[in-house]
Amino acid sequence: MLILLLSSSCQKDVNLEAVRLVERAAMPQPTAAGACFVYEDNIYLFGGRDSFSTNHNDLWAYSTTTDTWRKVPTHVPLKARVSASACVVGDCAYIGLGFDGKVQRDSSYLCDFWQYNFKTLKWKRLADFPANTTVKNCLFATEDAIYATYGFNREFTQDIYRYDIQENTWTKLDVSAPCSVPRAMDVVGATCQGRHFVGTGFNHGSLRFWAEWDPDNRQLIPRKKILGAGRNAAVCCATDDYVYLAGGRHYGDTLTTGFFYNSIQRYSPQHDQWEYVGSMPYEAENMVIAYINEQIFIGLGENKEGIIQDKWYRFEE
């Protein structure tokens, strides 16, 4: 079904621009706060929570060629969790970290880190993450390393750890950042044109910051802030030319000034500029977004009524 979406009258920061979303096959298991990664023609989704607030450790695959979801027939050795982190290097996915409980206890912050080989279909446990700041770490992958940025455990961080793929070791890096790049939790990020970008999130309020991670000089460099009010629990992906940011929520100073987002905006690394490009058919946090085969797919998440979504769309400009 082809949907033409205009700005939502209740969303203050959506311009009168149209975005075309093609509704695709719904996810069989409504999910929020899952970890997403792509390989060949499939979008993979690990973990997250369902409509009954149950955490899962299932691994699902969505085929972009057949428009079908399937549960991957593998014994996943990871515990059920939300807010895990994942990325792909070569023929392997790297998955782990996250939170497995509903109460704030140290054992709920998970430090395990795993490799899933798409060719052999085997799992391998790797070196544990060396800190317990394991909620929603944003991962950036290069050929020989993975950078785990930010994360959370009862305090806001600006930490960056480097995982050496060959040596199977983690190293905490000394990072240089100006005051305009805050400590935070619940950030998002993506790699575009070989450059790594991270931002938004929460620190005593929803944030608008946007920064570039320069691994060679170990610097977080301020970039143009996102449009509108701050947001956290958003999702982010990158095409060859742009970084797309969608959904999330804004925490207000009172119970009546907070709101959820359905807006989609994109960032041009070349021009260091943001622009609105449209909106989702619903407002939600902790959705999933992925770029694969020159297409963006987006959906799932939790709306402001606390309902976990199963909707799935292909985004077209």
Language-model features, listed with the residues they occupy:
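C-terminal motif of bacterial Sec signal peptides marking the signal peptidase cleavage site
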Residues: 6-9
